[in-house]
Amino acid sequence: MRRLLLPLAFLLLSTAAFAQVGELRSNLAVGFNGGYNLSRVDFSPTIKQEFQPGMMGGVTLRYTTEKYFALICAAQLEVNFAQRGWKELIEDGTYNTYHRTTNYIEVPFFAHLGWGQEERGVQFFVNAGPQFGFYLPSDKEEFYGFSEEYPWDESKRPGGTTQQYGRAIENSLEYGIAGGLGMEFKTGIGSFLVEGRYFFGLSDMFGNSKADPFGRSANTTITGKISYLIDITK
């Protein structure tokens, strides 16, 4: 948890610093978002993986506080449902297939910094800040053998790493750092946003004590998303 305090403190100090100068704004915008996730789990010892696809979507609130020279400063909060997980790249000659989908409610809190048009037009933006997640116990775990000749067989896994199979998620609370880059298209009927985002987990889904099989088991996710926002106050 201490690893999260530095970026959180930076976010709060940055917001406080911007609040002391610049042209004040008071713009509240709300809307919804949706997108596509490509996820992996950073395991130690390492498990070879491909990206596990999944969907995400939720609601967005953004409060713009001021314009500092050309920089438009805001705070952004989201509450999203997100599918994550991992898909193993099994290369031990068994032709087995394994993937697991995990579901989370994620709550990112961002410093949102934009450059461009405030009214109608295009604005480029950066989002950065902490993200918290809450695990929903509704996993989908799928594993297959290739044929009767090549059934499901864990015995040949590199390093004998098989403890992830069927293992319950032990830590329901997740935290990490997220950041994104995107473009906002401001129109007369609201704002349309396109964003690419990356999440780096700092917490582990499984226990990480010396007695546990994994020293690290943290989510990492690449997200492509679109959002629609409408101004409530200006």
Predicted feature descriptions by range:
Residues 20-58, 62, 231-234:
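Short glycine/proline- and aromatic-enriched beta-strand/turn motifs that initiate or cap beta-hairpins
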Residues 25, 174, 179-234:
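Predominantly the C-terminal beta-signal and adjacent terminal strand-loop region
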Residues 20-27, 66-73, 116-123, 186-191, ...:
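Short loop/turn motifs that connect adjacent beta-strands in outer-membrane beta-barrel proteins
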Residues 62-141:
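Gram-negative (and chloroplast) outer-membrane scaffold detector with strong preference
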Residues 26-28, 49-55, 101-107, 122, ...:
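Residues that define the transmembrane beta-barrel architecture of outer-membrane proteins
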Residues 1-25, 33, 226-233:
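Bacterial Sec-dependent N-terminal signal peptides
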Residues 42-48, 93-99, 164-169, 209-216:
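Extracellular loop and loop/strand-boundary signature of outer-membrane beta-barrel proteins
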Residues 32-36, 57-63, 81, 107-115, ...:
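Residues on the lipid-exposed face of transmembrane beta-strands in outer-membrane beta-barrel proteins
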